[in-house]
C-alpha cells in the first residue's frame, strides 16, 4: 500500500510499502526506589553489569527479565539486544543468571513484583507500560540506558487475503496520519512514530530528546523473521539457557 502518510515516518518504520510502524516502544530498566538508592541506579548496560558484581547479596533472586521461550516479545528483545552489543548482552545475561534470574512472560508481571518489593529491578520491560505505571506508583523508577535503548514498534499491514482491502487502506492511512497518531498518544498513551503528532513537551518528544544518540530502533524488515527459523530460534534459546544458568 503506497500511503501518502509514509513520507512523515522514519525510514526504520517502513518496509517495502507493506509493513508500517505505528507507535514505538522503548525497552526500559525498572527498579524499586526504596530498594535501590539513587546513587546506585545504573544508567548504562555496563553500569548494570557492575551493579550485579557489586551487590550480589542484595540482588540475588530479586532481578527479572522476559522469558524468551514463553514470550515472543522477549525473544525479539533479547535477540536484538544480542545483535546490538553481543559482548555486553551476554555478559549481562550471565551476570543476571548467576544471581538467580526470574523470567516472566509479561511486563505486567515484572512491574507488579518490582512495585511489591519482591524484585529490586527488571530488565527489558516495555517502556510505555513502565512509564504509565510509574506515574501512579511513585515507588517505581524507570531507566532509559544511555549507551543504547532498544526501540521496537507496533506494526500494521494489510494481509493479502483481506476481505475489505479498500477499507483497510483507509484505516491504515488514518492510523499513520497526524490525527491518528495523536489519538494513539492521547487516548492509549502510546508513543507515536510520527514526530509531528505531538507537542514539543509530549512524552514521545521528550523521550527522543533525552535519548538522542542512545535511541536504537529495531528496523522493520525481513530480519525480524529470522527467529521464525526453528533451528536459529532453538540455537538462541540454548545459548540463553546456558548463559542464565544459576551458579550451583
Region roles according to the model:
Residues 7-16, 132-144, 206-207:
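Ligand-binding "clamshell"
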Residues 28-35, 77-79, 153-164, 183:
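A bilobed periplasmic-binding-protein/Venus flytrap-type ligand-binding module shared by bacterial periplasmic
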Residues 110-111, 129, 168, 181:
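Short, hydrophobic alpha-helical packing/hinge segments within bilobed ligand-binding/sensory domains
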Amino acid at each position: 500500500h503506497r500511503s501518502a502518510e509514509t513520507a512523515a515516518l522514519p525510514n526504520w518504520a517502513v518496509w517495502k510499502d507493506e509493513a508500517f510502524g505505528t507507535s514505538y516502544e522503548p525497552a526500559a530498566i525498572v527498579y524499586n526506589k526504596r530498594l535501590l538508592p539513587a546513587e546506585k541506579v545504573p544508567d548504562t548496560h555496563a553500569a548494570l553489569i557492575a551493579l550485579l558484581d557489586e551487590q550480589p547479596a542484595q540482588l540475588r533472586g530479586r532481578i527479572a527479565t522476559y522469558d524468551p521461550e514463553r514470550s515472543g516479545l522477549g525473544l525479539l528483545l533479547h535477540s536484538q539486544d544480542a545483535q546490538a552489543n553481543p559482548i555486553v548482552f551476554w555478559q549481562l545475561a550471565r551476570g543476571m543468571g548467576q544471581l538467580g534470574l526470574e523470567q516472566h512472560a509479561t511486563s505486567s508481571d515484572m512491574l507488579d513484583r518490582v512495585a511489591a518489593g519482591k524484585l529490586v529491578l527488571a530488565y527489558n520491560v516495555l517502556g510505555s507500560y513502565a512509564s504509565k505505571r510509574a506515574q501512579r506508583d511513585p515507588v517505581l523508577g524507570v531507566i532509559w540506558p544511555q549507551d543504547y535503548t532498544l526501540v521496537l514498534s507496533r506494526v500494521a499491514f494489510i494481509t493479502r487475503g483481506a476481505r475489505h482491502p479498500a477499507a483497510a487502506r483507509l484505516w491504515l492511512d488514518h492510523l499513520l496520519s497526524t490525527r491518528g497518531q495523536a489519538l494513539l498518544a492521547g487516548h492509549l498513551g502510546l508513543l507515536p512514530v510520527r514526530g509531528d503528532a505531538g507537542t514539543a513537551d509530549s512524552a514521545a518528544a521528550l523521550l527522543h530528546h533525552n535519548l538522542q544518540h542512545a535511541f536504537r530502533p529495531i528496523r522493520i524488515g525481513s530480519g525480524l523473521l529470522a527467529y521464525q527459523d526453528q533451528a536459529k530460534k532453538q540455537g538462541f534459546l540454548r545459548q540463553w539457557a546456558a548463559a542464565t544458568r544459576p551458579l550451583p
